[in-house]
């Protein structure tokens, strides 16, 4: 019989046992009294947004005061870790099958595997660049057609009167495109909504996000982002490219499509989480490279934002994929622009060249840049707080697909109405000189030979607007135009992010920052006697764009390199780095980064690089799950089926033990086996009795496990007869005989470092006699969080 004691149910921990209010209010719409308490307490808007650090001092009793050493528990209805997320197996299972396969492989076999990895990375880069090219061409053509139709209508309506028809036309066109994109996301593949960067960060961190790298997700993501950008929303197409690259990498590296049920019999060796993770890292980097024309920035993004494992060869392969991606995009866009071989469009967004002679900066301007970084951090924190509360509202009340589509169409209509109103009432007319490069200039009420400057920002794709703010001549925009645009676009972008559409936040952030950055440059020139010092406001637009984007997403290293590569001027590396560091420091003081906020709102058990501070006094004994369900090395089939069928626990890893004597002494650890392995063994009827009676039966190989990967069948789909339940199963050949273990007194930071660095899914806690006393999983470690009141413990519940 299995060594089965009381099985641990995550939802039965502590005070979570059957509470009538169990479950997250973010999902079921229940009240949050603690929020109203904070509001009435007169806190600042930034402190209100930090539900994870709610003030608990007024609730401490004398009994609780005696146990101040324990981590405080955040109230259940405010912060949760969801049980619906499982971990990925980033640790190789070195069982007998694995070792035999490695032993049989020759030197040439290993060389062929290494070559295959490079080939896959090249394919990932090529396909990512090709997808980016398709997105860019479709958006350019459809947006160009839309704006030309609207422009012709505005010209006719201006002459005849009645511009309301133009407003209605603009709003209707926006709504139609956005409706199509929102229906695809809300009704067919919700995981394709947003930029996808938080989901890919979680995947690379080791969290299994359902449906995140499926073919259907890619199709909806690509078509959806086309509709979102053409629909005029305050979004960008660059963020979703990272998700698209990751999906392409996950599909290509497996040599088959489970969605299409097509197996190409290629790259079968890579059908495991460890290999797939490395290729997804390459896909994410290729997506960044295609988006910004920044291959080095793509590598650093993959390292900074997600990769849980890194080595030198992986760095080279990821860089190779990034270079292939940007070259592919560059090459095909040169053909599209009828300039074959003119490789001047390395990314979806082209910032243009920032020539050192024209846009040079002086040493005494660096303090001004740092001050702009602080302003960007503050505005980024404000953006994140507002989006945080808006997301909570959406989770509570806008959770039906119909409502999600209606909201997206409402935002599209409001965006069109606001844009039209701002252009209509703007009196900022600029001369239409020979150097003017805008494709859709609007004259409206301006004199002949002039155009409406406000229309340059609103009546355009976001990428063109950013480039205009960077490189337009001084005097192109007046301060009022830039101020009004910054204010309106800030709130439009905040409202838009989180809709059920495929969209990114990179370009809106750059656009907002470029607008107020250019405004700062104009104001500096106006208040100084020597205007030549601040002659070009374009450099302040660049600094403002970096500050705003850094204040929202809180990336430093990778974003610095991305901006430097996109501008083509390495001399701006130092000020951009200082600006991004300042924006992150200031922003983190008020609120977390936007991606981290959305990860927490989804209750994902995300593990950061380091364990929470002040946690050294906690040990493995206090954080582990116990008692543990164990299996004997030779176990009864019926017992295994019963354990796997137990929906109250749904464990995925089982220590394998062996009895050293016939007395009641606890059994000793001899290995670890996963649920997925047991499923395959049951499916192939790998029973001791059948093996004896069928001497010519084919021996189970690793290929059988790889063929079942990644969608292992549920236990309910496997038929086991009553006679088969009485058979025995020998796990010796299939279990991992050398699982990682720690003593009970190991400190939490050491457990965390081992778990995080090695990409583990299960960590066995054993006593001095090597007997199993507990099991540490991702959720055990993610429960502990450092808040402003010290170490806090999150709740675990089925959401």
Give residue ranges: language-model regions.
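Alpha-helical transmembrane segments and immediately membrane-proximal extracytoplasmic
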Residues: 2-662, 668-721, 727-736, 763-764, ...
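Structured, soluble regulatory/oligomerization domains located on the cytosolic or IMS-facing side
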Residues: 741, 746-760
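C-terminal intrinsically disordered, low-complexity extensions immediately downstream
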Residues: 754, 791, 797-799
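Conserved Rossmann-like nucleotide-cofactor binding loop
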Residues: 771
């Amino acid at each position: 019989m299995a060594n089965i004691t009381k099985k641990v149910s995550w939802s039965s921990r502590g005070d979570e046992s059957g509470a009538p209010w169990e479950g997250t209010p973010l999902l079921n719409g229940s009240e949050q009294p603690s929020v109203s308490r904070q509001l009435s307490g007169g806190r600042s808007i930034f402190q209100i947004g930090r539900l994870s650090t709610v003030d608990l001092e007024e609730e401490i009793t004398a009994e609780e005061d005696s146990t101040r050493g324990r981590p405080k528990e955040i109230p259940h209805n405010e912060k949760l870790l969801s049980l619906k997320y499982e971990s990925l197996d980033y640790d190789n299972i070195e069982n007998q099958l694995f070792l035999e396969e490695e032993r049989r492989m020759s030197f040439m076999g290993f060389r062929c595997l290494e070559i295959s990895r490079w080939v896959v990375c090249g394919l990932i880069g090529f396909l990512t660049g090709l997808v980016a090219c398709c997105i860019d061409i479709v958006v350019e053509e459809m947006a160009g057609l839309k704006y030309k139709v609207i422009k012709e209508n505005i010209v006719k309506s201006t002459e005849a009167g009645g511009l309301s028809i133009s407003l209605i036309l603009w709003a209707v066109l926006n709504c139609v495109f956005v409706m199509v994109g929102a229906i695809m996301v809300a009704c067919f593949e919700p995981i394709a909504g947003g930029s996808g960067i938080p989901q890919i960060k979680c995947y690379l961190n080791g969290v299994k996000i359902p449906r995140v790298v499926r073919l259907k997700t890619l199709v909806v993501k690509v078509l959806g982002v086309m509709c979102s950008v053409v629909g005029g929303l305050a979004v960008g197409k660059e963020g979703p490219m990272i998700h698209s690259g990751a999906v392409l990498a996950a599909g290509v590296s497996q040599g088959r499509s489970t969605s299409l049920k097509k197996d190409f019999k290629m790259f079968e060796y890579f059908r495991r989480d460890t290999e797939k993770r490395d290729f997804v890292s390459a896909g994410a980097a290729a997506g960044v490279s295609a988006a910004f024309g920044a291959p080095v920035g793509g590598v650093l993004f993959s390292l900074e934002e997600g990769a849980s494992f890194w080595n030198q060869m992986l760095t080279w392969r990821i860089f190779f994929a990034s270079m292939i991606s940007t070259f592919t995009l560059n090459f095909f866009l040169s053909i599209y622009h009828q300039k074959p071989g003119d490789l001047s469009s390395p990314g979806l967004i082209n910032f243009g060249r920032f020539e050192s002679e024209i846009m040079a900066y002086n040493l005494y301007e660096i303090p001004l840049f740092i001050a702009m970084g602080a302003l960007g951090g503050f505005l980024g924190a404000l953006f994140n707080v507002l989006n945080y509360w808006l997301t909570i509202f959406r989770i509570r009340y806008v959770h039906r697909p119909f409502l999600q589509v209606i909201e997206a169409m409402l935002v599209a209509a409001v965006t069109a109405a606001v844009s039209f109103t701002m252009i209509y009432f703007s009196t900022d007319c600029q001369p239409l000189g020979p150097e003017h490069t805008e494709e859709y200039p609007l004259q409206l009420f301006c004199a002949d030979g002039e155009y409406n400057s406000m229309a340059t920002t609103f009546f355009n794709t976001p990428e063109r607007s950013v480039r205009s703010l960077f490189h337009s001549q001084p005097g192109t925009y007046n301060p009022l135009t830039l101020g009004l645009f910054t204010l309106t676009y800030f709130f439009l972008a905040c409202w838009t992010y989180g809709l059920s559409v495929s969209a990114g936040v990179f370009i809106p952030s750059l656009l907002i920052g470029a607008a107020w950055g250019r405004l700062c440059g104009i104001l500096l020139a106006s208040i100084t006697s020597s205007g030549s010092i601040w002659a070009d406001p374009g450099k302040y637009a660049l600094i403002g764009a970096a500050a705003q984007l850094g204040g929202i997403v809180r990336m430093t290293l990778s974003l610095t390199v991305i901006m430097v590569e996109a501008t083509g001027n390495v001399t701006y590396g130092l000020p951009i780095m200082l600006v991004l560091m300042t924006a992150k420091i200031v922003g983190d003081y008020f609120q977390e980064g936007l991606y981290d906020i959305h990860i927490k709102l989804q209750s994902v058990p995300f593990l950061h690089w380091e364990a929470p501070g002040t946690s050294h006094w906690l040990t493995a004994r206090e954080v582990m799950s116990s008692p543990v369900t164990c299996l004997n090395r030779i176990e009864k089939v019926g017992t295994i089926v019963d354990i796997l069928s137990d929906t109250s626990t749904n464990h995925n890893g089982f220590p394998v033990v062996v009895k050293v004597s016939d007395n009641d002494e606890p059994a000793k650890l001899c290995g670890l086996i996963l649920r997925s392995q047991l499923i395959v063994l049951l499916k192939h009827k790998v029973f001791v009795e059948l093996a004896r009676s069928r001497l010519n039966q084919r021996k189970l190989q690793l290929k059988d496990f790889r063929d079942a990967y990644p969608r292992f069948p549920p236990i309910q789909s496997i038929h086991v007869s009553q006679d088969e339940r009485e058979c025995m199963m020998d796990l010796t050949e299939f279990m991992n005989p050398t699982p990682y273990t720690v003593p009970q007194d190991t400190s939490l930071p050491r457990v965390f470092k081992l778990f995080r660095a090695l990409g583990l899914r299960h960590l066995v806690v054993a006593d001095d006699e090597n007997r199993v006393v507990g099991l540490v999983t991702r959720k055990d470690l993610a429960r502990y969080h450092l808040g402003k009141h010290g170490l806090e413990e999150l709740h675990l519940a089925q959401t």
